[in-house]
Amino acid sequence: MANTTFSGPVISKNGFITTGPGATKTINSTGLGTAGLPLTVNAHAGRILISQDADGIYTLPSINANANSAVAGSTDYNNPNNLGATFMFYIDILATDVQIQTDGIDKFTGAAMIAVDDGAKKAFFPAAANDVLSMNGTTTGGIVGSVIQITALESAQYLVHNTLILGSGSISTPFSDT
C-alpha cells in the first residue's frame, strides 16, 4: 500500500489500529561495528522493534524539530520534521550489552523503571547529558520481556516513557553519556 499524507487534522471516531506484518520489525546490529544499526523514522518508528541481538547498538535518528521548506512550509509532505516519532523496543534475547543511543546531540528525558523478580523496583531519571540507555542483562536490565519506548519530544530531547526494564541483582541506572 502506498503512503498517504494529510496536511490537515485527521479525526478518527474509533481510533487507529496498527496490525499485520508491518506492525513489528526484527532488528539486530550484528556485523555493523560500533556505529550499530541506524534507525529511521520511515523504517522503524511506530512499530514494535524486536531486538534479537545480545550486544546490539541501536542509534536513534537525529531530531529534526524545524524543517519547513522555503516553498511549502509545514504543509510540504516531504517535510523531514520527526517530532512525535516513537520507537518501541522489545527485548527478545537476553541483553548482555545492548545500547540505545542518540546522535550525541539529542539527550534523554523522562524515566525508566527497572524491576527485579523479588518485587524490588526503581525508577531512574537520565541526567541532562545522558544520551545512552544500556542494558547488561542484570543490574541495568535487559531480561527477555523488557519494553522501552522512546519518542522525539522536542529539539534535542528524546522522551523515555512507558518503559519497564526487567533486571536482576542490585539494580542501577541504565542511563549514561557517550
Where are these regions (language model features)?
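Generic marker of residues within folded, mature protein domains
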Residues: 77-79, 140, 150
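Structured beta-strand segments within beta-sheet-rich domains
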Residues: 124-146
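Parallel beta-helix/beta-solenoid repeats that form elongated, surface-exposed shafts/blades used
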Residues: 1-8, 148
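Localized edge beta-strand/strand-to-loop motifs within extracellular or lumenal beta-rich domains
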Residues: 151-156
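Short aromatic-glycine motifs in intrinsically disordered, low-complexity regions
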Residues: 1, 59-60, 135-139
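Exposed extracellular interaction/assembly regions and N-terminal maturation sites
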Residues: 6-121, 157-178
